């Protein structure tokens, strides 16, 4: 329930920010767009002092955020009655009761569960 509310708030913030960016883009004139696109963009280099070109990845970031949200929502729908979901499918969840197939075989002596009737006395 709490995670659903957080997701809704996150989606609302993302949609509001994208609407704000769209309205700002509508205000900028075509001439300003041409001058901005002709200027080179530079990002700060590590410590070498060299300039390197900066590429905008706003569209990529938006699509990546969308993909992450879709995966989260799909996993939250698959969540069991406990409300837990698996972030990484190959990570085991240790609180689920399951048999250990490689170590649970006939003849295995589990002293904590054996009853007195099953124990054979040699007399």
From Swiss-Prot:
At the highest ranks, the source species' classification is: Eukaryota, Metazoa, Chordata, Craniata, Vertebrata
Alphabetical keyword list: Amidation, Cleavage on pair of basic residues, Hormone, Secreted, Signal, Sulfation
Pro-peptide residues, renumbered to this chain, are: 21-103, 115-123
Q: Which family does it belong to?
A: Belongs to the gastrin/cholecystokinin family.
Write out the coiled-coil annotation as residue ranges: none
What cellular-component terms does GO give this entry? axon; extracellular space
Q: Which InterPro entries match?
A: CCK-like (IPR015499), Gastrin/CCK (IPR001651), Gastrin/cholecystokinin_CS (IPR013152)
User: Which protein is depicted?
Assistant: Cholecystokinin A
Which Pfam family is an annotated match for this chain, by its short name?
Gastrin
What the entry says about post-translational processing? The precursor is cleaved by proteases to produce a number of active cholecystokinins.
Gene from which this protein is expressed: cck-a
Species assigned in the record: Xenopus laevis
Entry GO MF terms: neuropeptide hormone activity
Location in the cell reads:
Secreted
Q: Would I find Secreted among this entry's keywords?
A: yes
**GO BP of this protein:** digestion
């Amino acid at each position: 329930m709490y995670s659903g509310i957080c997701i809704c708030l996150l989606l609302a913030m993302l949609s509001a920010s994208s609407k704000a960016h769209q309205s700002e883009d509508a205000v900028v004139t075509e001439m300003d767009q041409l001058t901005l696109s002709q200027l080179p963009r530079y990002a700060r280099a590590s410590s070498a002092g060299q300039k390197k070109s900066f590429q905008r990845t706003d569209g990529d970031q938006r699509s990546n955020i969308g993909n992450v949200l879709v995966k989260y929502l799909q996993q939250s729908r698959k969540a069991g009655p406990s409300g837990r979901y698996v972030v990484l499918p190959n990570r085991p969840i240790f609180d689920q009761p399951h048999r250990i197939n490689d170590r649970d075989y006939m003849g295995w002596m589990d002293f904590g569960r054996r009853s007195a009737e099953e124990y054979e006395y040699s007399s």
